[in-house]
Design a protein with these regions (language model features):
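N-terminal signal peptide c-region/cleavage motif recognized by signal peptidases
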Residues: 21-25
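N-terminal secretory signal peptides that target proteins for export/translocation
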Residues: 1-5
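Short beta-strand->loop
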Residues: 115-125, 160, 180-185, 202-203, ...
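N-terminal export leaders
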Residues: 6-11
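Hinge/capping helix and adjacent helix->loop/strand transition within the periplasmic-binding protein
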Residues: 86-92, 107-191, 240, 253-286
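Paired acidic/hydrophobic, glycine-rich loop segments that form the ligand-binding mouth/hinge
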Residues: 91-97, 159-160, 202-207, 221-224, ...
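An extracytoplasmic/periplasmic, membrane-proximal ligand-sensing/linker region
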Residues: 33-35, 176, 216, 242, ...
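N-terminal (or domain-start) structured segment
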Residues: 26-118, 155, 165-166, 178-203, ...
C-alpha cells in the first residue's frame, strides 16, 4: 500500500518544526515565573547543605522567584537524585549534588534506577570542596611523608570514614602510596574525631568544612590537602601532589542538574544565573570559610568533567574491593 503526503501537509509539518525553537525560546524568556525547587541529598545543617544554601539564596535574588530547598538525604544522595530524575523537565526542579555521588555511585551500588549521564542535563558546576588528611594534634607526624613511612612499616593500620565518598578517597591514598590499612566506619565526623585525637585511627581524610573547626580548637592537625589547590584558611598545609603523590586529586565539586529533556534555552538561562553567582565576591568569601573555592563550568564543560570522573573512579573502587551495596 502506498501513502501519499500532500505538499500542503509537508509545508505544514515544516512550519511546525520551524516554530518549535521559537516556542522554547519564548518559554525561557518568561522563565522562571513561579517558585523554583532545589533538592539536596544531605541533611539540613550539614556542610553540603550550607554550601548549597549559599547558592540558593543568591539564586533567589537573581531569578526574582522564591527558591524552596528540599533536603532528601540517604543512600549516598541516590534518593535525591531519583526525585529529580522523575521530576518534570521544565527547569523548576533542580538537583544540587557532588560529583562523588554522580560519578561514584555507579560503581558503589549494584543497580540504580537512573543513569547519571543519560537521565540528567548539567546546568553548571559552581564550587569545589577541599578535604584534608588529619591526625591527632599530639601526633609525632609533621608531614605526609612521615605518616606514609609509618603506614608502610606496619600492617595493622586503621583509617576512619563516615561515608562511601570518604572510603574511596582513603583507598585512593592507600593505593597510590602503597600501604595496607583497614577501614573503621563511623556515623559522623564528630563520632570519629576522638579516635583521631587519641591515635586509635592512624589517619582520617576529613571534609575540610568540619576539619577547619577541629584544627582551630587544637584537637587535630592537617598534614595534607587532597585537592590540587591549597585551602585558604590553612595556607601552610601543602597538597598531596606537592608532597610527592603526583596527580593525587580528590576534591568533590558541586553542580546543579535538571532532568534530561529540559529545554536548552532554560538550561542556558539557569547556567547564566549560576555563573553570575560563582563570580560574586561574597560567595567566594563564604566558600572560603568552608574550605571551598568557586567553579564556573558551564553545562557542556560539566558534562565532560562528569564523564571523565565516572571513568576515573571505576578502577580505584574495584581495586579497593569495595562491595557494591544493594
Amino acid at each position: 500500500m502506498k501513502f501519499q503526503v500532500s505538499r500542503r501537509a509537508l509545508i505544514g509539518a515544516a512550519a511546525i518544526a520551524a516554530t518549535m525553537p521559537l516556542a522554547a525560546a519564548a518559554v525561557a524568556q518568561d522563565f522562571p515565573n513561579r517558585p523554583l525547587k532545589v533538592v539536596i541529598g544531605f541533611p539540613a545543617g550539614s556542610g553540603a547543605d550550607i554550601l548549597g544554601r549559599n547558592i540558593t539564596n543568591k539564586l533567589q535574588e537573581i531569578s526574582g522567584q522564591p527558591v524552596v530547598v528540599e533536603n532528601r538525604p540517604g543512600a549516598n544522595s541516590n534518593i535525591a537524585i531519583g526525585v529529580v530524575k522523575n521530576a518534570k523537565p521544565d527547569g523548576y526542579t533542580m538537583l544540587f549534588v557532588a560529583n562523588s555521588n554522580m560519578a561514584m555511585n555507579k560503581w558503589l551500588f549494584k543497580s540504580l534506577p537512573f543513569d547519571t549521564i543519560k537521565d540528567f542535563t548539567p546546568v553548571a558546576a559552581w564550587a569545589q570542596l577541599g578535604f584534608v588528611v588529619v591526625v591527632g594534634a599530639d601526633s609525632k607526624h609533621k608531614t605526609l611523608a612521615d605518616l606514609t613511612a609509618l603506614l608502610k612499616s606496619k600492617p595493622q593500620n586503621k583509617y576512619g570514614t563516615t561515608n562511601q565518598t570518604a572510603l574511596v578517597s582513603s583507598e585512593y591514598y592507600r593505593q597510590l602510596a602503597g600501604f595496607e590499612a583497614v577501614n573503621v566506619g563511623y556515623r559522623t565526623a564528630p563520632d570519629a574525631t576522638p579516635d583521631v585525637v587519641n591515635g586509635t585511627l592512624d589517619f582520617m581524610i576529613m571534609d575540610g568544612t568540619f576539619a577547619l573547626g577541629q584544627i582551630r580548637n587544637g584537637k587535630i592537625k592537617a598534614l595534607a590537602v587532597t585537592s590540587l589547590w591549597r585551602i585558604a584558611d590553612i595556607p601552610d598545609v601543602p597538597t598531596m601532589d606537592e608532597q610527592g603523590l603526583k596527580g593525587f586529586d580528590f576534591a568533590p565539586w558541586w553542580a546543579t542538574y535538571v532532568p534530561a529533556g529540559t529545554p536548552a534555552p532554560i538550561v542556558a538561562k539557569l547556567e547564566g544565573y549560576h555563573k553570575q553567582i560563582a563570580a560574586m565576591p561574597d560567595i567566594k568569601e563564604a566558600l572560603q570559610k568552608i574550605a571551598s573555592v568557586p567553579l564556573t563550568l558551564g553545562s557542556a564543560e560539566t558534562a565532560a568533567k562528569l564523564a571523565g570522573e565516572v571513568a576515573k573512579w571505576e578502577p580505584i573502587i574495584k581495586a579497593a574491593g569495595i562491595v557494591p551495596q544493594e
